[in-house]
UniProtKB/Swiss-Prot annotation:
Something else known: FMNH(2) which is absolutely required for this enzymatic reaction, is provided by SsuE.
Pfam families: Bac_luciferase
Induction: Repressed by sulfate, cysteine, or thiocyanate.
HAMAP family: Alkanesulf_monooxygen
UniProt xrefs under PANTHER family: ALKANESULFONATE MONOOXYGENASE, ALKANESULFONATE MONOOXYGENASE-RELATED
EC number(s) from the headed UniProt entry: 1.14.14.5
UniProt-recorded name of the protein: Alkanesulfonate monooxygenase
Length: 382
């Protein structure tokens, strides 16, 4: 099975280590452009742009990077309750047209009650999912060209319509991740691709089976994706050393404060991530080559695949055999690690790469010449 592999734009910060300013890197537009252009050239299908008050606005970041990339798709956040579904549909159609069909949308209900209250959204977990279902029903229908009247518990619109349609028909695909029962119900009814964070394969298989069954009851099929960090090196020993270095400057106080902050979230997915490590740096390999160290201080995706190229590829294929066809990867720092993933992991996978533009030329497609006129020895193909 051909796999779609995305990268990640770290609009909330980047660096060599977690939980410290040592080795930290300023993230400005120039740096984000470097990462996006690297992902574009290396053959990643797209980039996920995060959302929330700790991040730059995902829509504006995507719009700023469209002109400097050629094939890369941008997965940006839809925020039910923060914006009207009709306005969001107009924005989505515009971004899709301006990007020449490179816009994808990620439904984000939110999981931090404090942040949501600051944004003016005062709904419980259950109410947020009710509102998200209403939002998505309207957003989809408006983008597909309908004139919509809708009277819901949380959202009411009359005569909602779109004058300028999206380029992708009937509309751009909708992605969504959530681990609660309500999230799975929403995914089964409304989205094209259901995302999970990187839990052990058995747990992921269970979630896929649940969503697949719920979707089948509605006469639908849903694709599946997974969000993971990757630490890949030429040898497994080097990869595990890199994992250890990533948290080398983390002290127990920083871990405790991070976990206390994340504990206020009402996100079931966040709770499942935290349960993998229990706030302790002991026994972080929670499944073969699946390392939970990132989640000690990072919210959201908190696990990484660790190993050499063939080993990480084998773990990727294990997830693919469960039905996952889309992998959203990241690594610290994101510029350098995009090259490592492309050079050390891609050769061992059947990667679905965007088509190269016609007429693209290469100065040296083979690496640096030997003694100025001898082609380098061809590497063995795996």
């Amino acid at each position: 099975m051909s796999l779609e592999i995305f990268w990640f734009l770290p609009t909330h910060g980047d660096g060599h280590y977690l939980g410290t300013t040592q080795g930290a890197r300023a993230v400005d537009h120039g740096y984000l452009q470097q990462i996006a252009q690297a992902a574009d050239r290396l053959g990643f299908g797209g980039v996920l742009i995060p959302t929330g008050r700790s991040c730059e606005d995902s829509w504006l970041v995507a719009a700023s990077l469209i002109p400097v990339t050629q094939r890369l798709k941008f997965l940006v956040a839809l925020r039910p309750g923060i914006i009207s579904p009709t306005v969001a549909a107009r924005q989505a159609a515009t971004l899709d047209r301006l990007s020449n069909g490179r816009a994808l949308f990620n439904l984000v209900t939110g999981g931090d009650p404090d942040e949501l209250a600051g944004d003016g959204l005062h709904l419980s977990h259950a109410e947020r999912y009710e509102a998200s279902v209403e939002f998505t029903r309207i957003w989809r229908r408006v983008l597909e060209g309908e004139t919509v009247d809708y009277a819901g518990k949380h959202i009411q619109v009359k005569g909602a319509k779109l004058l300028y349609p999206p380029l992708q028909q009937p509309r751009p695909p909708l992605y969504f991740g959530g681990s609660s029962e309500a999230a799975q119900d929403l995914a089964a009814e409304q989205v094209e691709l259901y995302l999970t964070w990187g839990e052990p394969p058995a747990a992921v298989a269970e979630k896929i089976a649940q969503v697949r069954e719920k979707a089948a009851r509605q006469g639908r099929q849903v694709r599946f994706g997974i969000r993971l960090h990757v630490i890949v090196r030429e040898t497994s020993e080097e990869a595990w050393q890199a994992a250890d270095r990533l948290i080398a400057h983390l002290d127990d106080d920083t871990i405790a404060r991070a976990q206390a902050s994340l504990a206020r979230f009402d996100s079931v997915g966040q709770q499942r991530m935290a349960a993998l490590h229990g706030g302790s740096r002991d026994n972080l390999e929670v499944s073969p080559n699946l390392w939970a160290g990132v989640g000690l201080v990072r919210g959201g995706a908190g696990t990484a695949l660790v190993g050499d190229g063939p080993t990480v590829a084998a773990r990727v294929r294990e997830y693919a055999e469960l039905g996952i066809d889309t992998f959203i990867f990241s690594g610290y720092p994101h510029l350098e690690e995009s090259y490592r993933v492309a050079e050390l992991l891609f050769p061992h996978l059947d990667v679905q790469r965007p088509a190269q533009p016609e007429g693209r030329g290469y100065v040296s497609p083979f690496g640096e010449m030997v003694a100025n006129d001898i082609l380098p020895r061809q590497a063995a193909q795996s």
